[in-house]
Structure formats: structure tokens, C-alpha cells
Amino acid sequence: GVQKTETQAISPVPAEKLFKGSFLDMDTVVPKAFPEGIKSVQVLEGNGGVGTIKNVTLGDATPFNTMKTRIDAIDEHAFTYTYTIIGGDILLDIIESIENHFKIVPTDGGSTITQTTIYNTIGDAVIPEENIKDATDKSIQLFKAVEAYLLAN
């Protein structure tokens, strides 16, 4: 089955800086900005571009330990970034993959980020709504932590 969510957040950080910090430099920025969510990121394959596979060690703010991700698309001009979670205990043994699509749009004095998440479950498995809501809340927490880090640095 497929379950889909979309969330949006407004930021005072300019689109280019937000894109760079959130995605291009995420391996170093995110663990510094939100260590309780993401402890470390290790590149398993690739050079940081499309096709790169990473192992992410999660922090104490989540009930999970790891996730394996694959970068699917990066557009530095359109400020879009897509990655898929393809492994780890975060998939709960009922999810085949989780696609995360991000788009940052410049606004007067900042930017707007939209995240579309597509959960591809195994067979007819259904992810409980509270799990999806919790994942969405964690994404917003992560975004706000990165935003605060970028504003301070």
C-alpha cells in the first residue's frame, strides 16, 4: 500500500542557505544542529550526489536506531532534494521504503519548505496514523533545529 503526507514550514533563512545546510551539507550540519535526532551520518557508497547511500545513526529523541538512505535527486537551482529510506529499524518490518521529497521556495525575507513523504508499505500493511504524525513532528523539529543552527552560524 501507499500512504502520503505533506507538510510545510516557513523560515527566515534564505532558500540557498537553507538548501545548502539542510541537504548539501547535511552530514555535518544535522548532527551538530539536532544530535538528539541524528547522531551521525556515514557514507557507505557514492560521493554525495544522486545514488549515494548513507547509514544514519539516530539519536535518543526517536525510538529507532538506524536508517539507510539513498539520494534520488538533487537540483541546486530549483532547491529540490529527494531521498528514500531503504533500510533500518525505522521501517518497522512493514514498510518497504519511505520517499522524502523536499522543495524550498524563496520568499520575501526567507523561504518556504514543503516536504512530501510517501510511505510504501509491504503488501496491505497500514502504518498507524500516530506513527505518521510523530514522523512529521520529528521532521519539523529537525527543520527548526537546522534553521536555528544556520541563523546562529
UniProtKB/Swiss-Prot annotation:
Biological process terms in GO annotation: abscisic acid-activated signaling pathway; defense response
Keywords: Cytoplasm, Endonuclease, Hydrolase, Nuclease, Pathogenesis-related protein, Plant defense
SUPFAM superfamilies given in the database record: Bet v1-like
Predominant localisation class: cytoplasm
Enzyme category, top tier: hydrolase
EC number(s) given by UniProt: 3.1.-.-
Gene Ontology cellular component annotations, sorted alphabetically: cytoplasm; nucleus
GO terms of molecular function: abscisic acid binding; endonuclease activity; protein phosphatase inhibitor activity; signaling receptor activity
InterPro entries: Bet_v_I/MLP, Bet_v_I_allergen, Plant_def-hormone_signal, START-like_dom_sf
Localisation: Cytoplasm
SMART domains: Bet_v_1
Top-level taxon of origin: Eukaryota
Annotated family: Belongs to the BetVI family.
Cited function: Catalyzes the two-stage endonucleolytic cleavage to 3'-phosphomononucleotides and 3'-phosphooligonucleotides with 2',3'-cyclic phosphate intermediates.
Name of the featured protein: Ribonuclease 2
